[in-house]
From Swiss-Prot:
Component of the GMPPA-GMPPB mannose-1-phosphate guanylyltransferase complex composed of 4 GMPPA subunits and 8 GMPPB subunits; the complex is organized into three layers, a central layer made up of 2 GMPPA dimers sandwiched between two layers each made up of 2 GMPPB dimers. One of its GO terms (cellular component) is GDP-mannose pyrophosphorylase complex. It comes from Rattus norvegicus (Rat). Residues 356-384 are annotated as: C-loop. Belongs to the transferase hexapeptide repeat family. This is Mannose-1-phosphate guanylyltransferase regulatory subunit alpha. The lineage of its organism: Eukaryota, Metazoa, Chordata, Craniata, Vertebrata. It comes from the Eukaryota. Regulatory subunit of the GMPPA-GMPPB mannose-1-phosphate guanylyltransferase complex; reduces the catalytic activity of GMPPB when part of the complex. Mediates allosteric feedback inhibition of GMPPB catalytic activity upon binding GDP-alpha-D-mannose. Together with GMPPB regulates GDP-alpha-D-mannose levels. The gene is Gmppa. GDP-alpha-D-mannose binds at E85, Q247.
């Protein structure tokens, strides 16, 4: 018997995902046509012996989350439950706080997945590796280039046994090109080190003179408090993958993740990909179109395009490397490139909405997405264009490398701006 835990965080996380996270919790943002964490749940449901999937976070259980959980339970015929933390508890605190629910039914092991990663989720391969050598912690690792590895948790392994000898979260100097994917397989014994950290935090808290400044005994950071401390003690091992993987920290990385998932649909869900049909729009590459969307036959879509529920695409529209969300309208002959068009937004005819891709270097197979800040030297860096919810773009204007916050009605062109 197996279980899975998906760590979905909470509203004060995902600030780099704004303005998109204003409308829906980041884990429910549609990537390649389905909510981000549905990819995780699909992968978990395919593992033989999976009995239950738990979501842990500190979002209020609103209508969107409740509807998603109900739909997921029906689709995958598995219990999918949300466990709400009373306060942000870090990547490990929620696991310890809800340990009784996780261990109910005596699972052989349980997967732990961060919500903000895109992957092909080689969970069965991880389970096989775990059953060959049973250890408390198994981490999924991949490689990054020397410079970008500093942005991730870095793993030094024993090449023969794959034991983790050293672990540093976001080191200041180069440690290793093997990085942590944020996908784990834990045995029930893995909760004992979490208990030790909790008890140590309790003692430290009692010694603190100003308890108001102390985050609380329940806050446990898996990476710093557990992995770094236990590395080299024969408890943590790494399983390397060369499959697709990327973090989803910013809106730009959601667009890149959409491309990776759409490419993977060729193998896993070919029925989700649009096909060129007589009298239909021209399809280039991998495109997802929701069944309720209305697309004019003279439109040209793709590659890497995802069109949401109730979207209207007018005659002569050109759409490439973009996500168009629920209820948006692209009027005749608009051109949308490297952009995300928000819920219920309207782009006027002959308007152009364009961004600059921030993709990994295609000439470096180990390159990853750069999660840079929006600004450098006081200037907005070129990036994808994002239109928030219910934005209105007039006819015949250009919106380039800009972020437009929700409910704005523009009257002219903008370049390299954040429109508040």
């Amino acid at each position: 018997m197996l279980k899975a835990v998906i760590l979905i965080g909470g509203p004060q996380k995902g600030t780099r995902f704004r303005p998109l996270s204003f409308e829906v919790p980041k884990p429910l943002f549609p990537v390649a046509g389905v909510p981000m964490i549905q990819h995780h749940i699909e992968a978990c449901a395919q593992v033989p012996g999976m009995q239950e999937i738990l979501l842990i976070g500190f979002y209020q259980p609103d209508e969107a989350l409740t509807q998603f959980l109900e739909a997921a339970q029906q689709e995958f015929n598995l219990p999918v439950r949300y466990l709400q933390e009373f306060t942000p508890l870090g990547t490990g605190g929620g696991l310890y706080h809800f340990r009784d629910q996780i261990l109910a039914g005596a699972p052989e092991a349980f997967f732990v997945l961060n919500a903000d990663v895109c992957s092909d989720f080689p969970l069965s391969a991880m389970l096989d590796a775990h059953r060959l050598q049973r250890h408390p912690f198994l981490l999924l690792g991949t490689t990054a280039n020397r410079t970008q590895s500093l942005n991730y948790g870095c793993i030094v392994e024993n090449p023969q046994t794959h034991e983790v000898l050293h672990y540093v979260e976001k080191p200041s100097t180069f440690i290793s090109d093997i990085i942590n994917c944020g996908i784990y397989l834990f045995s029930p014994e893995a909760l004992k080190p979490l208990r030790d950290v909790f008890q140590r935090n309790q003692q430290d808290g009692q010694l603190e003179e100003s308890p108001g400044s102390w985050p609380g005994a329940g806050t446990i950071r898996l990476e710093q408090d557990v992995f770094s401390a236990l590395a080299g003690q024969g408890q943590i091992y790494v399983h390397l993958t060369d499959g697709i993987w990327s973090q989803i920290k910013s809106a730009g990385s959601a667009l890149y993740a959409s491309r990776l998932y759409l490419g993977r649909y060729q193998i896993t869900h070919p029925e989700r990909l649009a096909r060129h049909t007589a009298g239909g729009p021209r399809i280039r590459g991998n495109v997802y179109i929701h069944p309720t969307a209305k697309v004019a036959p003279s439109a040209v879509l793709g590659p890497n395009v995802s069109i949401g529920k109730g979207v209207t695409i007018g005659e002569g529209v050109r759409l490439r490397e973009s996500i168009v969300l629920h209820g948006a309208t692209l009027q005749e002959h608009t051109c949308v490139l490297h952009s995300i068009v928000g819920w219920g937004s309207t782009v006027g005819r002959w308007a152009r909405v364009e961004g600059t891709p921030n993709d990994p270097n295609p000439n470096d197979p180990r390159a990853r997405m750069d999660s840079e800040s929006l600004f450098k030297d006081g200037k907005l860096l070129p990036a994808i264009t994002i239109l928030g919810c219910r934005v209105r773009i007039p006819a015949e204007v250009l919106i380039l490398n800009s972020i437009v916050l929700p409910h704005k009605e523009l009257s002219r062109s903008f370049t390299n701006q954040i429109i508040l």
